[in-house]
Amino acid sequence: MLTRKQHELLLFIDRHLKQTGFSPSFDEMKDALNLRSKSGIHRLISALEERDFLRRRHHRARALEVLRLPETMPAATGKPPLAESGPPPVTAPATDESAAAESFVPNVIKGDFANRLAGASVATEAGAIHLPFYGRIAAGQPIEALRETGAQIEVPMNLLGHGEHYALEVAGDSMIEAGILDGDTVIIRRGDVAQNGQIVVALIDDQEVTLKRLRRRGSTIALEPANARYEPRIVPSDRVRIQGQLVGLLRRY
């Protein structure tokens, strides 16, 4: 269980990332927690790293990544946690899941993306970058393996961290309780490894592709939907290849 200060700092960083797209400075964290020096922030961040709640992106300034949120609140101290005060977080679709360690809170960029392909502009103050757009991926039932189309999509740079990325369009409703809706465009960090509880693009038998939450169970992998209407799909681990992890989401309004 986290201490109150660790809990407050984690929620402050998470809220700041959702509102601004980048990590708070050490001065901002120090002031938010009413600490006298930055050394206290360094100790709290190190403790959160050791408990796998937070990760520093090395070689980048102000680069912190929240890996998960705590399942329980800190012990009562007569003072409410930091997250209960201050401005509300960026609006995201409601989810039936609690703020569990593995819950994904969509970093939603709203806008008119009707003409977003083939170099169409998605203007943001933070700038934008072109990513490969691989078309629709089933969030309800697996579909054929992805084929490169040559299409591209322009996305805000603040959705991206380190690594190589690509974009997919969601088809289906099996991830709605994680805030991922039919027609959303998801941003995927390319990679072949993932932690338990992460939402991933999984390739099954080199033929089917699906967007689900990953759960390892001995020699098998459970690909879990975020919709009570669907059952998890249990597959031997040697039949599943991870194609990337979900890092962001675009929604057309």
UniProtKB/Swiss-Prot annotation:
Keyword line: Autocatalytic cleavage, DNA damage, DNA repair, DNA replication, DNA-binding, Hydrolase, Repressor, SOS response, Transcription, Transcription regulation
Q: Which reaction does it catalyse?
A: Hydrolysis of Ala-|-Gly bond in repressor LexA
The terms under GO molecular function for this entry are: DNA binding; serine-type endopeptidase activity
Q: What is its EC number?
A: 3.4.21.88
Q: Which sites are catalytic? A: S174 (for autocatalytic cleavage activity), K212 (for autocatalytic cleavage activity)
Q: Does the keyword Repressor apply?
A: yes
State the Pfam families in the record: LexA_DNA_bind (PF01726), Peptidase_S24 (PF00717)
Q: Give residue numbers for the site Cleavage.
A: A139, G140
What InterPro entries does UniProt report for this protein, alphabetically? LexA, LexA-like, LexA/Signal_pep-like_sf, LexA_DNA-bd_dom, LexA_repressor, Peptidase_S24_LexA, Peptidase_S24_S26A/B/C, WH-like_DNA-bd_sf
Class in the EC hierarchy, top level: hydrolase
Report the record's Gene Ontology biological process terms. DNA repair; DNA replication; negative regulation of DNA-templated transcription; proteolysis; SOS response
Q: Where is this region: Disordered?
A: 73-97
Which residues mediate DNA binding here?
26-46
Query: Family assignment?
Result: Belongs to the peptidase S24 family.
Role, per record? Represses a number of genes involved in the response to DNA damage (SOS response), including recA and lexA. In the presence of single-stranded DNA, RecA interacts with LexA causing an autocatalytic cleavage which disrupts the DNA-binding part of LexA, leading to derepression of the SOS regulon and eventually DNA repair.
Q: Quaternary arrangement and interactors, per the entry?
A: Homodimer.
Full protein name = LexA repressor
Which organism does this sequence originate in? Gluconacetobacter diazotrophicus (strain ATCC 49037 / DSM 5601 / CCUG 37298 / CIP 103539 / LMG 7603 / PAl5)
The taxonomy runs: Bacteria, Pseudomonadati, Pseudomonadota, Alphaproteobacteria, Acetobacterales
Encoding gene (name): lexA
